[in-house]
Amino acid sequence: MHASSLLSRRRLLGAAAAVTTVGLVTPAPAISYAPRSISLYNTHTGEWLRTVYWADGHYIREAVRDINWILRDHHTDEMRPMDAGVLDVLGMLREQLDTPEPFLVVSGYRSPATNMNMYLHGEGVAKHSYHIKGMAVDLRSERRSLEQVREAAMSLQCGGVGYYPRASFVHVDCGPIRHW
């Protein structure tokens, strides 16, 4: 798939994600209608989820709701609909790494208050983070090295990829293509 196709798809999916979770049943403009799945383990809450979140050309409302819960702000339990683009980045990353194991989630959605608190305490977060918009996830893998996760994410050319070896995670988002 060409980068321009992914960008167009991501923009359309981002527009669909602006709708509440209930609205996420619009067919995704994708070439393949193969089911998309992800597996997540929240390192802060101990909760895990393995689910098919897209099938037959539609996002599955209940699965997306469950993903939103797993990726909630663990400091406040606030939940926000995650951008469909970041769900697809996670799904493609899982396929690229060829592993059924769950991603170990360090951070998904962050409320503005949580993000500001982290920013003010010098925790290395961006003041206007994509996490606040539900467009980013910080993760790692048990069976794949951080370097493998970073390289796989960068090969997708689907958004931002940040490499944080000292904190033991890789940041992925569905914003502009960039890396650091």
Predicted regions, residues:
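Structured segments of extracytoplasmic/periplasmic soluble domains
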Residues: 70, 89-96, 100, 121-124, ...
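Cell wall/extracellular polymer interaction/catalysis modules
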Residues: 44-50
